[in-house]
Amino acid sequence: MFPALETHLKQTIPDPYEDFMYRHLQYYGYFKAQRGSLPNSATHQHVRKNNPQYLLHGSLGGKDDLIPDTLQKEKLLWPTSLSSAVHRQIEAINRDSHMLSLPHLRSRQLLYDELDEVNPRLREPQELFSILSTKRPLLAPRWPIECEVIKESIHHIEWAPPQPEYFYQPKGNEKVPEIVGEKKGTVVYQLDSVPTEGSYFTSSRVGGKQGIIKELAVTLQGPEDNTLLFESRFECGNLQKAVRVDTYEYELTLRTDLYTNRHTQWFYFRVQNTRKDATYRFTIVNLLKPKSLYTVGMKPLLYSQMDANTRNIGWRREGNEIKYCKNNMDDGQQPFYCLTWTIQFPYDQDTCFFAHFYPYTYTDLQCYLLSVANNPIQSQFCKLQTLCRSLAGNTVYLLTITNPSQTPQEAAAKKAVVLSARVHPGESNGSWVMKGFLDFILSNSPDAQLLRDIFVFKVLPMLNPDGVIVGNYRCSLAGRDLNRHYKTILKESFPCIWYTRNMIKRLLEEREVLLYCDFHGHSRKNNTFLYGCNNNNRKYWLHERVFPLMLSKNAPDRFSFHSCNFKVQKCKEGTGRVVMWRMGILNSYTMESTFGGSTLGSKRDTHFTIEDLKSLGYHVCDTLLDFCDPDQTKFTQCLAELKELLRQEIHKKFHELGQDVDLEESWSDISLSDIESSTSGSDSSLSDGLPVHLANIADELTQKKMFKKKKKKSLQTRKQRNEQYQKKNLMWKLKLTEDTSEFASTLQKHPAFFKNSESSSFLPMRNENPRLNETNLNRRDKDTSLDPSMTTLILPKNKGRMQTNLNRRDKDTSLDPSMTTLILPKNKGRMQVLHLIYCI
């Protein structure tokens, strides 16, 4: 009568709808159950309600993932959080993961509070677009199938150093390392299979490469063995090889961006089995940039697990004898540069990490967004959606932040602000600035509430999750720099960029976009600054510089207005900043935050900390309020200051050129691009163009075309044919005998040898008329004579056609069947000439 209430009723015939939804959701990674079984949706919702923060660990998207595997089980994993205690729970759950095995219910609409009690209620409707909520699980990161990934959970605490971390001051006696490599050293760590140039991304899965994870580090021979144990097969990790060249000295090789042979800048790896009293030297041997902030005092980052556990100390700047220079390696293609430093570890048998900058992983982002989605207050004005899926199938998140409007007219009047980060995966600076912005805009601060009242914020916190996960520095899994492809039409190859541009295009149709800003990191300049676009409209002249100037006043010890640049270069046409500007967003910027630190004010010669970067996110919000203040006093003052700064810059430029000019009348008509220098160029132009899989096909087609061109003879012009004919004619004359008069008399003495000689004429021999009707020599040879020692031989008709190829000019001609005349030498010496005459 009431089958839905029979909790232990076995379902022998699968429900078609349930079966369809199971297969559909399994494709997106929500279920990994045993073959032939169906998920208990009521049970899943019960678990999610009581334990909202869990990860569904499994693989999806690959061919093998579409078919349920009897050996695969559904694992419930707690996500990374800010508490180290929670992370210890993660590892325990990983070890003792279990599978939901409860009887399936017929009804899909009734739920139960307890498994043993009958208290049915209707299921709540699921949200269509929200991904992270108490009702939906997080998806684990997906890796290319070539990448091995360790199962350990890596987590770091946030920490602000109590004292400023000053730049390293070079002493001038820093050691220049001599790279010896594997010949004189011992390889102690090396990745087996690294996708490089020539290969391309094909598929992905959770956990990366299938099979048993190999132990790449060396095996210690005993407790006295002091060899360091290296590891980098985790999120954002990057280290390809480590070579031990001395007891405490190691040469390190970074992995290039996947499917490329370039972009070695970001590093992040783990070392174990440390010794406290020893001085270690590390040398990265394959860096590609000739300039670096390491030359002006930047230090690497060190993280000690023992310090984090016992003293609550996180990442800190460490290192001595730091030197960045060109190394002695030469592969014949491009020069390499090396970074070397020495360090003393704080503990014996410690687990430590080195990094180029403060890491911020895809899992860190997901945990932050999960906390927002589960916050009952923040979730009211922050809606989380999926913009798209990356090439590997990872979610690209889109946040819409605004307070609910009272009327439709009020909602339509709101202007929009678009912010994005991590299009370059190795620039984790952008994620920390973005986190500072989100912390403030989602807070209950009166300024934050006001901003939510007047703006609609569209936030893309991580545009390139694939690159972040695998530890790339600049490229996506397409092997290309996404910040050069904002004009792309290749949606399948660059989905993150294509959908971002499309979203902004639709947004512009709905409302005005006041500001677009993409958060980046810079490896060759200190401080923070903006790149913008000069406005050619005289009505809004210099308006694009007001926001950067205001930001420099709000953060005077971190932001440098004089480092800003507004020149639009041709090589930057594909960047987000320029494309959005051409789409109509006047205030379109790229914010560059240094990997180093500040040279300004109270923070002069100190490294940026995580808190410094997060404060920049707050200052973006503060500057937005100043920029949009109905009282235009600040705006007007900044505009006047900009005009004065520009006047001084123009005077300086003309003074450098040795010219004097009166700028009282027409100085505002001078093009701003003419007085601005170009931005310090990046090496992204090398990663522009087609995605690598299409580039490989294009290269193959080009090679085939070139081969065909070489094989096929090109047609000659008339002029070339005439020149070739004259040259051959001259060579022919030189081979003939010198006595032309005797040849003429020979022809007169033997007229019978030539049939119809009276009516014969000398016709030129052409390819289109190989059969000649004349008995005389070809017109090309009419001025030549045969040697008198020659004799003529008339061959009878029944001998058949004579096939000869002695004369290449006549190789395509056929002999007349009636008569063939050969002129042969009398003596047995070398033949001087052999000529065929065809008769009618």
Curated annotation (Swiss-Prot):
PROSITE patterns per the UniProt record, alphabetical: PEPTIDASE_M14
Top class in the EC scheme: hydrolase
Residue span(s) of domain Peptidase M14: 358-628
Modes of activity regulation: Inhibited by RARRES1.
Subcellular location(s) of the protein: Cytoplasm, Cytosol; Cytoplasm, Cytoskeleton, Microtubule organizing center, Centrosome, Centriole; Cytoplasm, Cytoskeleton, Cilium basal body
Alphabetical keyword list: Carboxypeptidase, Cell projection, Cytoplasm, Cytoskeleton, Hydrolase, Metal-binding, Metalloprotease, Protease, Zinc
EC numbers, comma separated: 3.4.17.-
Cofactor note: Binds 1 zinc ion per subunit.
UniProt xrefs under InterPro entries: Cytosolic_carboxypeptidase (IPR050821), Pepdidase_M14_N (IPR040626), Peptidase_M14 (IPR000834)
Gene Ontology cellular component terms for the protein in this record: centriole; ciliary basal body; cytosol
Family recorded in the similarity comment: Belongs to the peptidase M14 family.
Protein name as catalogued: Cytosolic carboxypeptidase 2
